[in-house]
Amino acid sequence: MALLTAAARLLGTKNASCLVLAARHASASSTNLKDILADLIPKEQARIKTFRQQHGKTVVGQITVDMMYGGMRGMKGLVYETSVLDPDEGIRFRGFSIPECQKLLPKAKGGEEPLPEGLFWLLVTGQIPTEEQVSWLSKEWAKRAALPSHVVTMLDNFPTNLHPMSQLSAAVTALNSESNFARAYAEGISRTKYWELIYEDSMDLIAKLPCIAAKIYRNLYREGSGIGAIDSNLDWSHNFTNMLGYTDSQFTELMRLYLTIHSDHEGGNVSAHTSHLVGSALSDPYLSFAAAMNGLAGPLHGLANQEVLVWLTQLQKEVGKDVSDEKLRDYIWNTLNSGRVVPGYGHAVLRKTDPRYTCQREFALKHLPNDPMFKLVAQLYKIVPNVLLEQGKAKNPWPNVDAHSGVLLQYYGMTEMNYYTVLFGVSRALGVLAQLIWSRALGFPLERPKSMSTEGLMKFVDSKSG
């Protein structure tokens, strides 16, 4: 309760009432996440039912021809509870900004970065957890982490030229054999119980993902060496970095930050929308998340931080490592004039510097201020936005999360760029699976939008203009 009160003071009266309401919903002394959900869900079901009865026919927005041909950009068509992306403020997790999460969410003993367990608790419940609640979640995931033997055998027999994301997707799909939801659905479980089985599967999957991801890493880059055993006294990120083979406490802190800030980014991005869509068919969390990972593997979604590193490396190769602002400016213009973009800058929704970039920059300033690659990234931060503004084409000239993450991973020795999207995937599970639980709890139906052909669209427009 003291933590909730502190949060209310930090966020002001606007959010204080929400925090007090959350405190009434579930005792801060309760550490069982499922029990808290069981209390929250009926209240939220009733609230939404009343809202729909009163406002179900209210028009939310208009759809244009350009939206239909342009990837549905800007089209309001989904309800997604766990996070909202504001063009100016960036992502808010259940109403909390990244700086607020960094301040309020529990941290490891001696650590400074938020624990992803706390972020998951927040995404699921809307409440800032206590240290005891986060500790319960760490131990619960450790208890559920063991992989079935057929998945281990599968991972060990993949060819080394199979992309890490393909391995992740296949292994998660194979975990479907363990699905509580699929089994219960086949036995005719009541719809009101769907969320409980989705919760169990989601908890199991999140617990097992670091083991899968670490095994992929060890098989591909560490000659198949063992990942070791899960330590129930360590947090989720610490166990993950141990299994990867990294013992630097700063790298573990980076991983806590990385897994927190990449967890969710509203519902319209490819991975979030895919899990939502596939889950609406009542596919279990393993199948839904595997589908999301196939979307994340696409170069337009999950490969951006690799593209940044490739561009930075090429820049250093062509103009040197200690480059003047003037030479850097010329190189940026050459990139743009050749028809290419500056990777790591711009965003489909954001119109300011991505707060996920900012917190990584702060981490670098604290832990690696003299690293040459970080200094180059910092130098670009001063120059690129002005060049893009001069060019006049970019709606958002500011850096996004991908402009920084790869540089930090490289500094601590993780140089295998093909693997970076796997880390992204492990993190993204927190957001999309939290939402999947709520999608089933709220009874969201099968997603089935109406499509039109170009011919049909032309006839429709003609009828409107005539």
Swiss-Prot record:
Q: How is it modified after translation?
A: Methylated. Trimethylation at Lys-395 by CSKMT decreases citrate synthase activity.
Please name the InterPro entries in this protein's record: Citrate_synth-like_lrg_a-sub (IPR016142), Citrate_synth-like_sm_a-sub (IPR016143), Citrate_synthase (IPR002020), Citrate_synthase_AS (IPR019810), Citrate_synthase_euk (IPR010109), Citrate_synthase_sf (IPR036969)
The places in or outside the cell where this protein is found are: Mitochondrion matrix
Q: In which pathway does it act?
A: Carbohydrate metabolism; tricarboxylic acid cycle; isocitrate from oxaloacetate: step 1/2
Q: Where is the transit peptide?
A: 1-27
The modified positions for N6-acetyllysine read: K76, K321, K327, K375, K382, K393, K459
Q: What chemistry does it catalyse, as a reaction equation? A: oxaloacetate + acetyl-CoA + H2O = citrate + CoA + H(+)
* UniProt keywords, alphabetically: Acetylation, Methylation, Mitochondrion, Transferase, Transit peptide, Tricarboxylic acid cycle, Ubl conjugation
> What S-S linkages are listed for this chain?
none
GO cellular component entries = mitochondrial matrix
GO BP, one example? tricarboxylic acid cycle
Q: Which residues carry this modification: N6,N6,N6-trimethyllysine?
A: K395
Give a yes or no for keyword Acetylation in this entry. Answer: yes
Q: Which NCBIfam families match?
A: cit_synth_euk, PRK09569.1
Job description of the protein: Key enzyme of the Krebs tricarboxylic acid cycle which catalyzes the synthesis of citrate from acetyl coenzyme A and oxaloacetate.
The subunit field of the Swiss-Prot or TrEMBL record says: Homodimer.
Q: Which family does it belong to?
A: Belongs to the citrate synthase family.
Q: What is this protein called?
A: Citrate synthase, mitochondrial
